[in-house]
From Swiss-Prot:
Its main location: Golgi. It comes from the Eukaryota. One of its GO terms (cellular component) is plasma membrane. This is Protein YIPF4. It comes from Homo sapiens. The keyword Membrane applies. The lineage of its organism: Eukaryota, Metazoa, Chordata, Craniata, Vertebrata. GO terms for biological process: endoplasmic reticulum to Golgi vesicle-mediated transport; vesicle fusion with Golgi apparatus. InterPro entries: Yip1/4-like, Yip1_dom. It is a multi-pass membrane protein.
Length: 244
């Protein structure tokens, strides 16, 4: 009877590990196959992803960009156009009541000029000056722009520190006295003497309101050189209204 031999070598299956010595580890090679895993995220996601890829490949990826809402894009229309109705109303009161004793900060008309307020005043004055002739509107606006430019250049020559926008705003707002006397002239138009006095009063009112804002202390003895052309400018505005 033969003695029992050594037990047979254990052959590992696919699910077992095989331990080898470090000397034999250098001769080992192989690969691990990745499992085929598929996720079903729905047909809509696949279509959207395909469309996105298609657009990006052809340079239209900017169509897919989503911008955050900017609070500045939701401003009211008046704010977008830089129209401050309260500021315009305050400036109108400053022009119509130029007396310093009333306590208005009249320098705001000069120091904080705007465009829409004077433009509205000039357009309103043009409308009441039509007399069936629409070309009067464009003519009055032209006189406003170039008349203000003349006053601006004269003020700069005399040494005044004033901008063209400031002159444009002051001259435009100061047309308000002529607008105020317009309905009065319709009533007393048949009385020549009274009508003439009202016209002179309106011109002096407008010229004083504009000159008191534009003529500063820097002019000193040169004030008449600037007040006189302002007075002539409003006489011309009045002549466009009365048809003289």
């Amino acid at each position: 009877m033969q003695p029992p031999g050594p037990p047979p070598a254990y052959a590992p299956t696919n699910g077992d590990f095989t331990f080898v010595s470090s000397a034999d580890a250098e001769d080992l090679s192989g690969s691990i196959a990745s499992p085929d895993v598929k996720l079903n995220l729905g047909g809509d996601f696949i279509k959207e992803s395909t469309a996105t890829t298609f657009l990006r490949q052809r340079g239209y990826g900017w169509l897919l960009e989503v911008e955050d809402d900017d609070p500045e894009d939701n401003k009211p229309l008046l704010e977008e156009l830089d129209i401050d109705l309260k500021d315009i109303y305050y400036k109108i009161r400053c022009v119509l009541m130029p007396m310093p004793s009333l306590g208005f900060n009249r320098q705001v008309v000069r120091d904080n000029p705007d465009f829409w307020g004077p433009l509205a005043v000039v357009l309103f004055f043009s409308m009441i000056s039509l007399y069936g002739q629409f070309r009067v509107v464009s003519w009055i606006i032209t006189i406003w722009i170039f008349g203000s430019l003349t006053i601006f250049l004269l003020a700069r020559v005399l040494g005044g520190e004033v901008a063209y926008g400031q002159v444009l705003g002051v001259i435009g707002y100061s047309l308000l006295p002529l607008i105020v006397i317009a309905p009065v002239l319709l009533v007393v138009g048949s009385f020549e003497v009274v009508s003439t006095l009202i016209k002179l009063f309106g011109v002096f009112w407008a010229a004083y309101s504009a000159a008191s804002l534009l003529v500063g202390e820097e002019f000193k003895t040169k004030k008449p050189l600037l007040i006189y052309p302002i007075f002539l400018l409003y006489i011309y505005f009045l002549s466009l209204y009365t048809g003289v």
